[in-house]
Amino acid sequence: EMGDWEFEVELRNLAGHKFPSGYPSRIAFIEFELQDPDGNTLFHSGEWTPETGVIGRDETWEPHWETIESEDQVQVYEMVIGDVTGAPTQVLERASVLIKDNRLPPRGFSTNHAAYDTVQFGPMAALDANFNRTAQTGEEGSGSDRMTYRIPNDLNAATVQAHVTLHYLSVPARWVQSMFEWAEDSEEIASFQSMFESADRTPVVVATTTTWAYRGFDQNDPEWRLAPSAIGSGQPLRLIPPGETIPLEVVLVDALGRTVRSVTPDAALRGFDVSDVASGAFFVRVRTE
């Protein structure tokens, strides 16, 4: 939507099996944080604390998301099993139905395989056109998931930085909570609870990335713009054209008009690195015809 910040996140499974795999307590979740240039948090999905676990994760089970638009929505990759009544359970002997399974499949995974009924996706992931399908052709077997974070552009920031982290957690506290209710009646459970609560249960970082984004152009603005106007450490420089004008040639020059470097139009529109350029005032010369 016009005026929204929008980021597409793609995860690719590099393992030869579903991720996370093995015992169904294991989860992976995406932490997405949007900050202004001063480091102030503007949006945060998937934050984790020792006291609450994954903030925003639903009490029963979190839906599989294709688009996230609020902080109480978080993408959690997991398998959720249900008992004969359809209620989620952590007791394997009571498992009767598959409520959710959006764990990332390995590359080449096919729903047409003869054994698919034993390793099938949950219903929500199966309906996601971006889950295990390539962006170009829509063919399955990509071993990936693509999702969108859409955030209203009412944050009073022309430049933002997005931090995306994939976390892995082997045993969330809620998985063992029902077992701990029996600690007074079981010395073994009480002993395990003591060890569990004293252990470092910080999620493992699987992958992380950071990117900058800038407020889009106004179709009615007749002027070329650069974003940001003042470059901070590590920030790329982006050329924003008026309307749908496409540059043919882009040159970065210094205050004396000397050429610092030529930039391809594609790189100029996406944002290019200037970290190796000395501090000072610079201009961009653009040719459109």
Regions found by a protein language model. Give the residues of each.
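Short, conserved sequence motifs used for protein processing/export or organelle targeting and
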Residues: E1-Y214
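C-terminal outer-membrane/trafficking sorting elements
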Residues: N220-A227, G232-E289
